[in-house]
Amino acid sequence: MKYLFCIVFFLLGCETVQPLDEATTNLNLWNEKKIVNYSFSFKRVCFCPLEYVGPHQIVVQNGKITTVNGAPYNAAERYGVMYTIPELLQVIKANIDRKPVKSILNFNQTYGYPTTIFFDFSEMIADEEIGYEITNFKIN
């Protein structure tokens, strides 16, 4: 009887460990690689002005965006806010936490950066979807 009580007590004290979401898993992979100088093409998939959609060529040095389309980066300019890979992975995680009705999540298996991401947050609302595409990734 003591053993049964100990087993039940032990099992009740255990917590269920939730698996990491894909964005967190890939952010961890990205961080393991310690990449701080890189470039990539970034495209938003949305019903947005073409200047906002892109594609935009982004250059990151020492973990900060330095240029967008060959010009010094300024978030207030017509392209809107651009993201480094870790920032984009945080945006993706925040969107996963919103529990979209549909999502497509594809990541580079070597480095963990997102390649194709898409979220639809409501089947009943048109044009609220958002997606991101990263191509031409290169470590500098």
Question: What positions do the PLM features span?
Answer:
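Sec-dependent signal peptide recognition
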Residues: M1-I7
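Short, surface-exposed coil-to-beta transition loops
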Residues: L50-P55, P100, D127-I130
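Mature extracytoplasmic domains of secretory-pathway proteins
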Residues: V59-S103
